[in-house]
């Protein structure tokens, strides 16, 4: 509601950067968008290995159903069995080059390709939900699983979750869970990580034609609806279908939370199509096709992120937040080519540090490099302004910039909508981010905690963003740019 309302009166590419820089302050708008760019590039670096992992899983599904592909678990891996080192880096760069091919398509072609791939991915998601529940049974899954795990049973996997403290042995009331200051905010922070990017349509609003408010609102609500169904309803339903405690323990082992299950069952995370082929191998072609949707979705997210990042960078260049050449629009692409290339290069750098142990200890999340869990947490910390400033914009816009929202939809309700929204990110960041940091600083492992969770890395990028802002403001002032006028007006269409 906030994005669709503000986009209606400020229909420009750049999204919340444009809103925050005009409503709050140019510095806050810059820092919010700078940290969102870093968070989004981290997400791209997070998604690329997942594309490779899902290729492995797809091959394993064929192997379980029809035979062969016994070595799929070692594809793209080094001696440790993880997608890292030189094999992982080379494979990741190949995926990044394919992402670049899509990201560098002319705008109309880009959106046609993205729409087609998204349609395929959503169809696979629906197919897994419907056919997975109809054509598989928990009893078959439990009976067949030991054949593919070297004798490890579903019950044993579930028990390891209890031993590691991942599975609760006592239950609390609904409201005590909702207002928990421990696990619930942590899980919500992970969920916010999944949802970064839903605001894509608001960030390309300068390219939306027709009824901007309606188009952006439908696109945003549609993205959120799919996100809720995919991350909550779908996952919970399928997990409960195959045994909830087993799935939580299995997934916890993949992400490093279940220390009692060191060997990953089947050598893979508990992908839904993989669970389905264990339960009913006769339908392996169906599960394989659905698994390809799992390859497409993380791949698809990457060029979409690059596209909306480039539109933010275009808005930066128009506001002299970065050199003007950064936002030069290519006639062929109808988009800022230099910004897209810069984003791809930065992603490649992060992929390098995910693959090789070349980071100083204080910057590494584990073993002198970034790991996937550390990358995710790093991104969550970087996104704090992205999740909070829209609420402050909604609360303050009628007082700070009444000229901009005189005719805005939901204008009178915006302060209340913003206040209601702020409850969620503030609750999450206070108890899932700030509280653990404070506790770590009080304890004896403060430096280790700050290193392994990417907090130090995030602090460095915040500092880099601040330095860039003041350097560019100095350059703009020296060039005689009227900054007050610049940030009073919205960027040109």
Regions found by a protein language model. Give the residues of each.
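Helix-loop-helix junctions that connect adjacent transmembrane segments
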Residues: 68-86, 116-214, 218-282, 288
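Hydrophobic transmembrane alpha-helices that form the core helical bundles
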Residues: 1-92, 96, 299-309
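C-terminal membrane-solvent junction of multi-pass transporters and transport-like membrane proteins
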Residues: 84-87, 99, 107, 113-116, ...
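TM-loop-TM module centered on a large, flexible mid-protein loop between adjacent transmembrane helices
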Residues: 18-20, 25, 60-62, 162, ...
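Membrane-water interface regions at transmembrane-helix termini and the short interhelical loops
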Residues: 5-9, 31, 79-82, 94-123, ...
């Amino acid at each position: 509601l906030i994005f669709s309302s503000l986009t209606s009166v400020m229909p420009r590419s750049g999204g919340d950067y444009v809103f925050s820089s005009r409503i709050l302050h140019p510095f806050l708008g810059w820092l919010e968008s700078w940290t969102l760019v870093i968070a989004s590039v981290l997400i791209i670096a997070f998604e690329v290995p997942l594309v490779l992992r899902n290729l492995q899983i797809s091959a394993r599904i064929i192997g379980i159903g029809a035979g062969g592909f016994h070595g799929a678990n070692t594809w793209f891996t080094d001696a440790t069995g993880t997608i890292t080192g030189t094999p992982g880096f080379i494979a990741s760069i190949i995926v990044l080059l394919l992402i670049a091919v899509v990201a560098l398509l002319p705008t109309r072609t880009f959106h046609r390709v993205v729409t087609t791939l998204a349609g395929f991915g959503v169809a696979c998601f629906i197919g897994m939900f419907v056919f997975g529940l109809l054509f598989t049974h928990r009893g078959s899954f439990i009976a067949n699983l030991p054949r593919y795990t070297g004798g490890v049973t579903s019950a044993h996997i579930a028990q390891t979750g209890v031993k590691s403290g991942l599975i609760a042995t006592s239950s609390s009331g609904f409201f005590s869970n909702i207002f928990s200051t421990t696990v619930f905010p942590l899980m919500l922070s992970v969920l916010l990580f999944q949802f970064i990017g839903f605001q894509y349509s608001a960030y390309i609003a300068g390219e939306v034609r027709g009824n901007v408010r309606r188009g952006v609102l439908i696109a945003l609500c549609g993205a959120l609806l799919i996100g809720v169904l995919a991350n909550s309803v779908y996952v919970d339903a399928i997990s409960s279908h195959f045994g909830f405690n087993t799935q939580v323990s299995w997934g916890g082992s993949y992400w490093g939370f279940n220390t009692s299950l060191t060997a990953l069952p089947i050598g893979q995370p508990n992908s839904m199509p993989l669970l389905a082929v264990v339960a009913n191998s006769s339908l392996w072609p169906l599960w394989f096709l659905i698994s390809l949707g799992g390859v497409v979705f993380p791949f698809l997210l990457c060029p979409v992120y690059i596209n909306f990042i480039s539109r933010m960078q275009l808005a930066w260049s128009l506001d002299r937040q970065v050199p003007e050449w950064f936002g030069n629009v290519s006639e062929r692409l109808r988009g800022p080519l230099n910004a897209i290339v810069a984003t791809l290069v930065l992603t490649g750098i992060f992929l390098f540090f995910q693959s090789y142990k070349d980071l100083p200890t204080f910057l590494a999340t584990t073993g002198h490099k970034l790991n996937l869990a550390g990358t995710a947490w790093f991104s969550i910390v970087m996104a704090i302004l992205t999740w909070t400033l829209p609420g402050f914009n909604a609360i303050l816009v009628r007082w700070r910039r009444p000229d901009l929202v005189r005719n805005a939809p939901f204008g009178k309700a915006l302060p209340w909508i913003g206040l209601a929204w702020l409850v969620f990110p503030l609750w999450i960041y206070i108890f899932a981010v700030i509280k653990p940091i404070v506790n770590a600083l009080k304890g004896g492992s403060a430096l280790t905690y700050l290193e392994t969770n990417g907090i130090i890395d995030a602090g460095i990028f915040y500092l880099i963003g601040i330095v860039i802002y003041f350097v560019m403001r100095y350059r703009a002032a020296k060039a005689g740019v009227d900054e007050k006028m610049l940030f009073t007006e919205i960027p040109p269409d």
